[in-house]
């Protein structure tokens, strides 16, 4: 019987391991002689992904609560919306946690600057936003964990929009 071999794309595996470090603040992974770590979690992700340190409209806002972390800013040189989301340390393709965060950011900016007539589109233009949540029993829309459909940050914790707004 012939042994089966798995082949991995080095770059893809490296990217996956790096995302685990971003979503799990303090995690250190050694891979192929390289130490991977993101001591500042999602803040490190934001700093790595933005085009340059001078490319922000304001410093990255990084908040942590029980069972979640967020980081966001607006890009000075691009109007594209950029999102990264994680559930229990695994990258997702968005979901209820990301939508709740987007709603909270829009609501906070609109209420903080009532004299300006900002639309949701105006507020989200150029945003770089990332979120990581830990949920005991997450509910996903697909078996491959692509999109979170749970509505709470954690079973015991506050809803994300309430936490950010406070």
Predicted regions and their residues:
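GHKL/Histidine-kinase-like ATPase module
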Residues: 2, 8-14, 18-145
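Flexible helix-coil linker/hinge segments at domain or subdomain boundaries
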Residues: 24, 113-116, 153-166
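Short, low-complexity, polybasic intrinsically disordered segments
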Residues: 138-161
